[in-house]
Amino acid sequence: MLSLATLDMLLSISEGELIEEMVVGLLAAPQLAIFFEKFPRIKRALMKDIPGWKQNLQQRIREASVPPGLANEFSLYQQSLLEDSPQFYAHLPDIVAQLQDLHSPFATQAKTLVQTADLAKNPPGGDSLQTLFLQRWRVSLILQTITIHHQLLEQEREQLLAELQRRLALSGALEPILTTNDNAAGRLWDMSQGHLQRGDYQLLLQYGDFLQQQPELIRLAEQLGRSRSAKAQPAPDARYEPYTVMVRQPDSVPEEVSGIHQSNDILRLLPTELVMLGMSELEFEFYRRLLERRLLTYRLQGDNWQEKTQQRPVSLKQNDEQPRGPFIVCVDTSGSMGGFNEQCAKAFCLALLRIALADNRRCYIMLFATEIIHYELSADNGIEQAIRFLNQHFRGGTDLAACLANTLNKMEDREWYDADAVIISDFIAQRLPEELVRKIKIQQQAHQHRFHAVAMSAYGKPGIMRIFDHIWRFDTSLKSRLIRRWKR
């Protein structure tokens, strides 16, 4: 079967010019021109796809077949080219008849040429009629082939235009939320290839609007994103600078039972002491021991971490830009993180995705409760994954240790060796195993990994939060929310 590309080659038709003409006409479409004027960043991202479009169209032409009628006509034309003048004139009536049988557009013109020449009365004296006939026939074949090209390219144009309009609508809606520079616009354009309709990404728009109403959350994400932007280089002249360390002090914070002692703490009485209140003979003895602080009670003990400022020698020569690694974001989905906390946590992840797109970084989300759920928001299908993430509800338990263990395993992967871990939680959880804390310290010291805590509550346990390099506080209590609103 004759292919369209072969016919182009034999008739010396330039398919590249036809494709170029189609692409130029497509980009000049009024609906696209208006959109490009409104979103120039997305236009620049789209222009990078044009070479790929042309290659796909060329491949489509190579795979297309010529209709049987045109293929038979072209075969007849090739046979006629090989004949000398006597043979050609002898077969000319048969050629005209075959053209009529094939319903060729050239059939009428061929019949007219033969009738005008009147070969029966005026035998040809040269090859002028043969040359004219073959030239007109070739022109007709070229026109038929170009018509097939136009039909094929028009189908591709309609499909491509519909796809572009869908992707442009998606990118245009998300552009104010997720893009801050050309790099982010390009990555957003690449991520818009999924089969998403307008109703699918409405949730993204809702959280984008919520994020705009929380400017403090945006600033917090930007500060976290820039926190690894520079590193200090030593210089010969040393000087001192203050720095803050966390000092551990034993305290009676209710973290764990460490024994029994004598006190007057009614809330932590042993059951045997309460028995005395039920016996009239021992009731006065109970009150006497209460006044003397000699009642047997549970001893609850934990760690109280306080900030202490010290001096250390430091020398700085310059700040050299560091490559910014990907984000591994762990989100607490326990019941205490529901409601406004859930909205803030999801919006903060959206803000981190915006930074990741702008800085060409990756953004990996892990939800920790009774099981670990993974999403990579910066992947090619990142928009679909972001929508699935935003549809999650925070109603589980808290398993911070399992999440941190998964984060450490992820950091062992070569693709994530320079990642920053971001933990979003209220940090009202059980104490971390000492072995896990030790592994985290190794990652921090040996591999320069940074662990960030985004605390959504003022009541997080100090014993948990001491492992983090940075603690970013965003108190979601009603009082703090009212204060932030009043300051705007």
UniProtKB/Swiss-Prot annotation:
Annotated compartments: Cytoplasm
GO cellular component labels: cytosol
Principal place of residence: cytoplasm
Keywords from the UniProt entry: Chaperone, Cytoplasm
InterPro entries: Uncharacterised_CoxE, Uncharacterised_ViaA, VWF_A, vWFA_dom_sf
Function: Component of the RavA-ViaA chaperone complex, which may act on the membrane to optimize the function of some of the respiratory chains. ViaA stimulates the ATPase activity of RavA.
NCBIfam families noted in UniProt: PRK10997.1 (NF008230)
Family membership: Belongs to the ViaA family.
Assembly and oligomerization: Homodimer. Interacts with RavA.
Name of the protein in its database record: Regulatory protein ViaA
Source species: Yersinia pestis
Gene: viaA
